Amino acid sequence: MPGMPPFDFKANYLKFLNHEETPLIPNEFVGNSILGFGAVNGPSIEKGGADGSPDGFGVSWVCPETGAGAAIPKPGEFLLEDICDWREKVTIPDPASFDWEAEAARELANVDRSQSVICFGFGNGVFERLAALMGFEEALLAIAEEPEEVNALFEAITDYKIKALDYIQKAYQPDVVTYYDDVATERDLFVSPQTFRELIKPHHKRFAQACIERGIIPFYHCCGKAEALVEDMIDCGWNSWTSVQATNDLESLIPKYGKTINFIGGWDSTGRPGTPYATHDEIVAEVKRVMDTYGKFGYGFSFFGFRYPENGDPAVMAQFMGEIVGEAMNYSIGLMMQKLGAAQ
């Protein structure tokens, strides 16, 4: 932007990670490189191969045209009907069997660490993995009827994910690892807060603490209305809650908790701004709403917005993301320049 002095976007993002005030509202795609699962479907050990081969657990994944490129378990082919059979039916992968070094070399080829934080996305937390193995309905029934068996499976999954951390750290040397485990819908949690705290949270906490022990900053990704769990997220040790949707009361959460846990998101991803039909003016208006409403505190918030193409076309997705990120950067830089001018 004309008149803008040299600016270190990575340093700005690091301030955000340290829960400090930032001169510029952070943007998840500027000064931060998202690798692994998140930008794409990530290592095949978690989401299967592009050729349709199953993941390390034996689950086959497909990318429906209406899913914006996101992989889902192949419909009608769940591996597990009875949670009590998980030891016989489910393969817990050995992270040593996957070529993390080759995956990292490919993903890091065009990344400049001097300019960017490295954030590795590690998909399929314990609840999502249970749903991938059984389907959501059977997974929820298993949680209600056989919590001891579910807990035993969650222990095994978490053991694997913590072992994988060492391979990820060696190959990627990430600053951040994001743990993906959607436990909510747009309206509410899939399970009661008590059930979450008894059955799911201990495994989240164990993984987050394993990251911290290795010097890695742990992020927690959860779509949906999960604001009731913010204090649990803090207790687990998550640095940030990412992909926070507008259904949560971010305007209240940031000043209350933003010096302890960061909030990343704010975009109305389930409203018109998240659709392929949004106009440029609607995108600009949503950028301003998010920045003005959540960025005004100067801490505890990073912008993250996206919209879905109709058929998952990567070129269209890149165009959509370029528009959103570009408008967000122009607006946030303008806000920063206004503050600098007012301070002089």
Where are these regions (language model features)?
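Short aromatic-enriched loop/helix-cap "lid" or pocket-rim segments at secondary-structure transitions
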Residues: G38-G42, E65-G69, P73-K74, A131-A132, ...
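N-terminal accessory/capping or targeting/presequence segment of soluble
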Residues: N18-E20, L24-P64
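A contiguous, low-structure linker/loop signature
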Residues: D51-E101, V111-V117
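Active-site loop segments of alpha/beta catalytic cores
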Residues: M1-N32, T91-Q344
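Alpha-helical interaction segments
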Residues: G3-P6, K47-D51, G76, N151
